[in-house]
């Protein structure tokens, strides 16, 4: 393990001892805010320190076994060689585990998300593919045990969506979907194509973490224009009676959000405001993400929405993720919701990149 990482672990060990003392301090115990904060930090640090103690113990065992290699007794030397080999294997495994524990954690990983899918080039076929992508992510959400609800939709003339916005709720949603943002290209023969020619269309996907109240940008009500209108979505006769749909325009940024899925104007407004907060947060963080990506030459995680990240080729049954040069011939399974076949290699590549930069 790199010396710089061992130094970080030594500093973390000192902090662990400090936290242990603080949590036993009567003054801290009486202050629930501080006590909760220290308890959370302690819970995060403790597994790392316990693993580090195991690492140091195995390191000492290795040094002891190596010293016995110089012994005059051949049997003892043979035994020492076995112990050295075993200790080196354990040390390597513990070192790998510790490095992963030290990887910087994305504070958004545990958050719910807003999923935006928009048809790009390709007209009707792009809208149809937007519908296919939404179905793919909906199936994936079901497989993960997540809840997905549509906030806004603009249907295409021949099926699919010109635009569809959904909120996805569950465990570690952003952690698994954060690399889906970008341009998704489809190559296939449209149903309306009589001569069997392959057409290329594209859609854009954006995945925005839903900020909590503490993380959300403070929005000045004076910066908002709120319009209400009659919902064009589901709801039977109700949609013709009340202006329950809500459209909110953030005047300084020009961002517009709308929600029409609930029968209650109040609920639609609350969901639209949450979506607006996510978009404003995303806009603020985009520049920082781009700076990090360009500095470290990252392709995975650059967050560039215009970047073509994936191609779905139906005639060949192929899906290709261009960021990591991954090609799979299981397009049917992926479109039915087995998106983990692409997501898992992306996460592994990103983690490998983080590990490479860890000791810098």
Swiss-Prot record:
PROSITE patterns: RF_PROK_I. The keyword Cytoplasm applies. Methylated by PrmC. Methylation increases the termination efficiency of RF1. One of its GO terms (cellular component) is cytoplasm. SMART domains: PCRF. InterPro entries: PCRF (IPR005139), Pep_chain_release_fac_I (IPR000352), Pep_chain_release_fac_I_sf (IPR045853), Prokaryotic/Mito_RF (IPR050057), RF-1 (IPR004373). The modification N5-methylglutamine is found at residue 237. GO terms for molecular function: translation release factor activity, codon specific. Gene3D superfamilies: 3.30.160.20, 3.30.70.1660, 6.10.140.1950. Keywords: Cytoplasm, Methylation, Protein biosynthesis. HAMAP family: Rel_fac_1. Peptide chain release factor 1 directs the termination of translation in response to the peptide chain termination codons UAG and UAA. This is Peptide chain release factor 1. The lineage of its organism: Bacteria, Pseudomonadati, Pseudomonadota, Gammaproteobacteria, Pseudomonadales. The gene is prfA.
């Amino acid at each position: 393990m790199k010396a710089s990482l061992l130094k970080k672990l030594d500093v973390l060990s000192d902090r662990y001892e400090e936290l242990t003392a603080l949590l036993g301090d009567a003054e801290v115990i009486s202050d629930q805010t501080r006590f909760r904060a220290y308890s959370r930090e302690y819970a995060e640090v403790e597994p790392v320190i316990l693993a580090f103690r195991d690492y140091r113990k195995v390191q000492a065992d290795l040094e002891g076994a190596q010293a016995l290699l110089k012994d005059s007794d051949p049997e003892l030397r043979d035994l020492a060689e076995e112990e050295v080999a075993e200790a080196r294997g354990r040390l390597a495994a513990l070192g790998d585990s510790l490095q992963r524990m030290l990887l910087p954690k994305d504070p958004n990983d545990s958050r719910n998300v807003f999923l935006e899918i928009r048809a790009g080039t390709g007209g009707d076929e792009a809208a149809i593919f937007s519908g296919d992508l939404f179905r793919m992510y909906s199936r994936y959400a079901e497989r993960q045990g997540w809840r997905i609800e549509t906030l806004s939709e603009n249907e295409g003339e021949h099926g699919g969506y010109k635009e569809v916005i959904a909120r996805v709720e569950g465990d570690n949603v952003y952690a698994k979907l954060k690399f889906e943002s970008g341009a998704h290209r489809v190559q296939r023969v449209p149903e309306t194509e009589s001569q069997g020619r392959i057409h290329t269309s594209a859609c854009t996907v954006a995945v925005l973490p839903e900020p909590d109240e503490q993380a959300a940008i403070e929005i000045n009500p004076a910066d908002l224009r709120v319009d209400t209108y009659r919902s064009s979505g589901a709801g039977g006769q109700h949609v013709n009676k009340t202006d329950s749909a809500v459209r909110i325009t953030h005047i300084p940024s020009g961002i517009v959000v709308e929600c029409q899925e609930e029968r209650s104007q109040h609920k639609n407004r609350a969901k639209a405001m949450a979506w607006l907060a996510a978009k404003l947060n995303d806009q603020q963080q985009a520049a920082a993400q781009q700076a990090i990506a360009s500095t470290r030459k990252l392709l995975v995680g650059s967050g560039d929405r215009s970047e073509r990240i994936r191609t779905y080729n139906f005639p060949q049954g192929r899906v290709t993720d261009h960021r990591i040069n991954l090609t799979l011939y299981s397009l049917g399974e992926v479109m039915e919701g087995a998106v983990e076949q692409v997501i898992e290699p992306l996460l592994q590549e990103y983690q490998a990149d983080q590990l490479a930069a860890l000791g810098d």
